[in-house]
């Protein structure tokens, strides 16, 4: 019986192969996290600001603060 011959290990390009794999993985994961943040946080925040300013009356708030005495220069 002939002894089993082990295959020769690949010695060239190991770092490049690992870097290529990990860079692609990191890029895909970062795109996924950015998309999740946009749809779960940023869009909700943007909608909340739009809803607030849709009905916001700056003059009404100003008059309320003036009547409360917050401003020293406006009587």
UniProtKB/Swiss-Prot annotation:
Transmembrane segments: 14-54
GO terms for biological process, alphabetical: oxidative phosphorylation
UniProt topology in membrane: Single-pass membrane protein
Major place of residence: mitochondrion
Example of a GO cellular component annotation carried by this entry: mitochondrial inner membrane
Pathway given in the UniProt record: Energy metabolism; oxidative phosphorylation
Pfam family, one: COX6C
Function, as annotated: Component of the cytochrome c oxidase, the last enzyme in the mitochondrial electron transport chain which drives oxidative phosphorylation. The respiratory chain contains 3 multisubunit complexes succinate dehydrogenase (complex II, CII), ubiquinol-cytochrome c oxidoreductase (cytochrome b-c1 complex, complex III, CIII) and cytochrome c oxidase (complex IV, CIV), that cooperate to transfer electrons derived from NADH and succinate to molecular oxygen, creating an electrochemical gradient over the inner membrane that drives transmembrane transport and the ATP synthase.
Record protein name field: Cytochrome c oxidase subunit 6C
């Amino acid at each position: 019986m002939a002894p089993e011959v082990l295959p020769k290990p690949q010695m060239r390009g190991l770092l490049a192969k690992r870097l290529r794999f990990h860079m692609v993985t990191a890029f895909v994961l970062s795109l996924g996290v950015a998309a999740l943040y946009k749809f779960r946080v940023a869009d909700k925040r943007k909608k909340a600001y739009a809803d607030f300013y849709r009905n916001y009356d700056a003059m009404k708030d100003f008059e309320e603060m003036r009547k409360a005495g917050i401003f020293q220069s406006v009587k």
